[in-house]
Amino acid sequence: MLRNLDPVLSADLLWVLAAMGHGDDLALVDANHPAETIASSTTSGRLIRLPGLTMQRAARAILSVLPIDDFEPEPVRRMEVVGDAAAIPDVQRAVQSEIDKALGRSSPLAGIERFAFYDQARRAFAVVQVGDPRPYGCFLLRKGVIAGEPG
């Protein structure tokens, strides 16, 4: 048992988050995403499933321990709605809120066309699939660094 960790963070998910390096992406995807197929091409080959959670809840847990890259102008990206790239579905607004809270500032999500998103997700470190069935709940989060003195 560990203290002060969100209980949503399983041992496998914590391993993935710890093993990622600065600049690695994590694909955080909805229940409709072809996660098994995409995960097999990622750096780690790992698919972590979080069934029964909303995307917002999963994002909150992950962002409680994952630093977002602040060297990158677009460290968090979202899958665009097919046929309406400017549309922001409710699931994306909810995750945007969690990202803004985690960063302490507004950081708009950059849009990526659906098939370009799949290509970028294949180059991610791992895939986390959430049980949220709402479409376009697909994100790429780029890991940043933790500043400080060695201990």
PLM regions with names:
Residues M1-P51:
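Long, hydrophobic N-terminal alpha-helical segment
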Residues N4, V8-D12, G21, L53-R57, ...:
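Conserved active-site and cofactor/substrate-binding residues in soluble primary-metabolism enzymes
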Residues D6, S10, L14, A18-H22, ...:
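Generic secondary-structure signature for well-ordered alpha-helical cores
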